[in-house]
Amino acid sequence: QPPAEVSDQRVSGLTGAVHSPPKGPNWAAMPTVRTPAGGGDAHNVRSLSVMWTTRLVRSGLAALCAAVLVSSGCARFNDAQSQPFTTEPELRPQPSSTPPPPPPLPPVPFPKECPAPGVMQGCLESTSGLIMGIDSKTALVAERITGAVEEISISAEPKVKTVIPVDPAGDGGLMDIVLSPTYSQDRLMYAYISTPTDNRVVRVADGDIPKDILTGIPKGAAGNTGALIFTSPTTLVVMTGDAGDPALAADPQSLAGKVLRIEQPTTIGQTPPTTALSGIGSGGGLCIDPVDGSLYVADRTPTADRLQRITKNSEVSTVWTWPDKPGVAGCAAMDGTVLVNLINTKLTVAVRLAPSTGAVTGEPDVVRKDTHAHAWALRMSPDGNVWGATVNKTAGDAEKLDDVVFPLFPQGGGFPRNNDDKT
């Protein structure tokens, strides 16, 4: 249900959430959604595309090429998966004849050892973080229980990139991953993990052991889940769970139940984090709308699940609440529409905001129902398609379904542009 009112609370350090295209390989056009100015009919929308053409980065890819060969070539994961824009992107209406993104999977599946039709990869353990490759055909996926990060592809067998030691007790483990904004140069990945004593943020270099960035985040029997995202080339935002204790989320001296800002993340002499937002329950997901720079925060509290918004002007509002607590998880946003995974009800819904007011224009639309069951992560690929990753093996489903990485719109069309874009 929509919130009763909008808060004018300000959050330090989350301004400038509109970002510049990073240097790296070409990205395909990404379809966007836009509601009419003035908050008119939310279903009358038009498709836009943003063309990002950048220089191909040739250095530092040899280590990753061995992971995904076959017909897909070398899997590439660069700055653009972690670094949002720092300048307003130029948006131009595309001709009506511009086709939407094609079906994300080939008509004939690659003959993998794990036969899982209709997905990029099957036979996974319960997943957490997901990073799409710049070719829209490869990805990095994290397994929460095992701590493994796997390189996967639509046309190659998976390969383990690294295994991070974690304690998966309760809902902890390897909870999210994100690439450095300068990944093409430094090959660094950040992870949010559980240890036997705490939750923490670590940095992982290729072929090296994890190095601590932020430690001492309270750990509990539940409420450990969280998320990571870069809101600028130098700012890492961390959403931490309340460790099962809402009082910790309200305690300014605790790192639990917060959206934290880490400036210039480093393993030596790290500046203490600052709190951007308090009162977080169990973490769901973080996502940025690259068109208007809004940061969306999905979390689960004792009274309701909710979706909050932090604008590029650092204003905070509650976008939507779910009193029935369907289990909000990962999200993806584009031009005022936010897709949110609901784990308990096996749904993905689209929440739409009016551009002039930021108010929700109606009940969330269901864009996925039951397909692949319980999905957590949700990420957009550069070609405009949307991908999810499931947590069936740990979601209490009696069927004990395999966990997979799958396209949200298998028939193509990409990010939903109107209420007819449903599966």
PLM region spans:
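Sequence/structural signature of beta-propeller domains
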Residues: 46-48, 52-423
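Short intrinsically disordered, low-complexity coil segments enriched in acidic
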Residues: 1-6, 314
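Short, low-complexity, intrinsically disordered N-terminal modules
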Residues: 4, 14, 18-21
